[in-house]
Design a protein with these regions (language model features):
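Phosphate- and other anionic-substrate recognition elements at nucleic-acid/protein interfaces
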Residues: 1-156
Length: 156
């Protein structure tokens, strides 16, 4: 039975990526704006897995927290979206691990320290790996999905 992994970069500027290492297939979407959108996308992945005989997807959710200097309203909105994702994942019965950014980034290797350079590095890394153009907004989610087998301990 083929394994399927879902990488999630939470936040309005993030995304969700599904990855099947068996056939190297990826599918991604910009973070849905609503809880219903999150639920629908993840539930459709489960349905597709059932149709083709894949195992139940394993999720890696980037563990996030508020940042110094972030406004109160934006921090609340960010945390609310993160909690909604946790709820949807639990409601669908998906196995999930939460991983801080440094942990999944370490699986890729040495990266630039500056954020914009690091984002470009990650985008280039996923494009080389996938052989396709990947939008910047979803590059982290794709990278998380690609390193998910390692994070789950499934790469033996």
């Amino acid at each position: 039975m083929s394994e399927v992994y879902i990488g999630i970069d939470p936040g309005k500027a993030g995304g969700i990526c599904t990855y099947c290492p068996t056939n190297s297939h990826i599918d991604y979407v910009k973070m849905p704006d609503t809880v219903h959108g999150m639920f629908t996308y993840l539930n459709n992945i489960i349905k597709q897995c059932n149709l083709v005989g894949c195992s139940m997807p394993k999720v890696v959710l980037e563990k996030v927290h508020s940042m110094p200097g972030q406004g109160v309203a934006s921090t609340f909105t960010f945390g609310q979206g993160y909690g909604q994702l946790q709820g949807v994942i639990a409601a669908l019965g998906l196995q999930c691990i939460e991983v801080i950014p440094n942990k999944w980034m370490k699986c890729i290797g040495s990266m630039p320290k500056e954020k914009s350079e690091r984002k470009k590095f990650i985008k280039d890394w996923v494009e080389k790996r996938s052989g396709q153009s990947i939008p910047l907004y979803v590059a982290d989610a794709v990278a998380i999905a690609y390193v998910a087998p390692t994070l789950w301990g499934d790469n033996k």
